[in-house]
Structure formats: C-alpha cells, structure tokens
Amino acid sequence: MDRQIAKPSIREENERAILAAAEAEFAEQGFGGATMAAIAARAGVPKPNVYYYFPTKERLYRAVVERVLNEWLEAASSFDTSDDPAEALTSYISAKMDLARVMPLGSKIWASEIMRGAPAIQDFLDTTLTQWVRSRERVVRRWIAEGKLKPIEPRVLLYMIWATTQQYANAAHEIATLEHGELSDAAFERAKRQIIETIVGGVVAR
C-alpha cells in the first residue's frame, strides 16, 4: 500500500507564499524600502494575513534571512555523513552552487544584511552560525590529523567556498554581462565542476 504524502496545511502554504514574496521584495527594495503592503500584494494575500503570521516587518525579515542560512547549513550535511573529505567537500560545494542558482535572492539579502553589520541577526551569528562553524572546524582538523587534507586553516577553506559559490548569486548581473547572457545550465555545470576541481584538488592530500 502506497504511503500518502501529507499535503501542506493552509497555514504552511500561506507562510511559504509570504516568505517567498518577502524574499523578492527585500532583495529588490532592501529592508527600508520594502513594505508589508507590497509583500502582501506579491503573495496574493490580504495585508492583515501577513501581520497575522509575522506581526512586524522585522520579524518577517528575520524569518527570511534565517531561512536562507538554514538552507546553507543543511547543504553541509555531508560533513556529518561522510569520512571522505573529497566526497564531503564536493557535495557541499555542489549544493551551495545549486542554492546560488535557485535561491539567488536569498543570497543577495544575506549579503546586504552582513554589509549593514547584521543588525537583525547578530544573535543568530553569535550562536547558530558560530556553533556550526566550530563543528565543521573540528571535522576538517580531524581530516588533517588523519592525513586526508593538507594542513590548511579550516575557516579560510569555508570562507573560500562561501565567497566562490555566493558570487554566482550576488554578482549574477555582472556574470551575465561578461558572459553576454545568463549562464545556461550546461555552462553553470561546467563552472561548478571547475570550482570543485580547483578547491577540492587544492586541499585534499595526495
């Protein structure tokens, strides 16, 4: 007997629509320029509905930014499931590149928030992100001790991956200009392979 997949509740559907609309509005207008009315219009719901789920613009903005970070953290699950650094790093970089492709607006919002000094999410950086980075540092240091990775600084490796992958979202217009159009799926996959080969090939011990 096939197991039925539960349908999302009305609340889940509404929250999802509002978050998607907010992501687009914040990316285009910034936090200061975005309005709850414009977000409601994008989501196709009455403005009171937005306030019902997210009582303030600040709460909605934080929810959008946290969702972006949670997607990125989930992309690194390979660190927990693989003892092979080449496999884990390849999976992580590939997932981060794919997120840059399908969630470019979220990456732009994150970059804007960080450039503003992270006023909305500093506590999140101090706790969730810091704990996550420390846990990944321990994994990388273990791989180094086991002779699987070259003696590198774990945080520099993470910063390199973040900067390279998020460039394809944050600078999408610049890339499209230089490439005379948006990257095709095939061109994007070639870029992904080259990034993986460069980073992974540069840190894995041979």
Indicate residue ranges for each PLM-predicted region.
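N-terminal intrinsically disordered/low-complexity leader segments
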Residues: M1-E13, A20
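C-terminal peripheral helix-coil segments that are non-catalytic and often amphipathic
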Residues: M1-R3, D98, V102, T130, ...
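Helix-turn-helix
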Residues: E13, A17, E25-R59, A63
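Amphipathic alpha-helical linker/stalk segments
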Residues: R62-S91, R136-R141
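Hydrophobic alpha-helical connector segments
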Residues: S77-K108, P154-I161, E189
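All-alpha amphipathic helical-bundle segments outside canonical DNA-binding/catalytic cores
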Residues: E87, D123-T128, I144-M160, R190
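Amphipathic alpha-helical segments used for helix-helix packing
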Residues: R101-D123, A171-L178
